Amino acid sequence: MRAGRLKVRRYKTRRHSPVWPILLGLLALGCAAFWLLRDTDAGAFLRFTPALSPQDRAAETRTLVLPGKTWYALQLGVFEDTASAGDLAESFRLRGAAGYIARREHYRVLAAAYPTRADAQAVQTQLRTQHQVDAYIYEIPRPEITLRLTGQRAQLTALSDAYDALDQAAEQLFALSQAIDQGKEQDYRAALTSTRETATALRGRLAALFDAPPQAVQQVMDLLQALADGLEQAANAQSAVRLGAQIKYCQLLCAVGMADYAAALAP
């Protein structure tokens, strides 16, 4: 059988407050949705792969929870057009900021992502007093999503691993960014290579398990590919400033990407 389109059933639940973070977070909205595939829909999700063991080919139903998460971003500017946003983003990349452009109602240029508002406020103050740069704290919320999926064991495991890897990458890249900004000695490129190889391997697993990936799976594959590409650019950076900027960019890529992914499935 070939992989088809996933069917989504959403249920309303309570909502939390949202978030996401040169040297700077992300989103959180906290609602919960349920993505349900009935047993009769299993064939739409499954593709039997001869290379898999009988256990991995077996159909099962599993509940996956994508937890809510809020990052706090320092926003440098908001624009109606991409050209203006791009110009500002590049000017700040040269100074070590991510220069990440989030397409949210308008084009928002973000400098970095922080796990707490206090962290973002500390850098916001530093930018204003030491560099005469005004930045706005922009919250990017990610809703909590509960997914009840039916598919091959190998498919469900690969998807769960991809969710975990993208969240872990955002946290690890934040830690790397902080270390670089503080001038700590560390083997940055080894860490970047490890994360890039993980993203590439997970994308390959998902591609091998789905003939025609459902949209929800394809979005994860695209995000993993974008992360791998971004990390390769970071590894090839020719200066510490460019390295720090690209690491912040990749962190925001994960944080914003997963927030948008969860929000699309929320009720």
Question: What are the language-model segments listed below?
Answer:
Residues 1-14:
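N-terminal Lys/Arg-rich, disordered targeting/topogenic segments
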Residues 9, 39-40, 234:
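Low-complexity, intrinsically disordered/propeptide-like segments
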Residues 19-39:
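Hydrophobic membrane-insertion alpha-helices, especially the h-region
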Residues 22, 42-151:
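Solvent-exposed beta-strand motifs enriched in subsets of small alpha/beta binding domains
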Residues 35-38, 69-78, 176, 207:
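Short charge-dense sequence patches
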Residues 134-140, 161-164, 168, 239-249:
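A detector of long soluble domains/segments in diverse envelope-associated and cytosolic proteins
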Residues 154-230, 257:
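Alpha-helical segments in soluble extracytoplasmic regions
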Residues 211-267:
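Extracytoplasmic/luminal low-complexity segments enriched in Pro/Gly and acidic/polar residues
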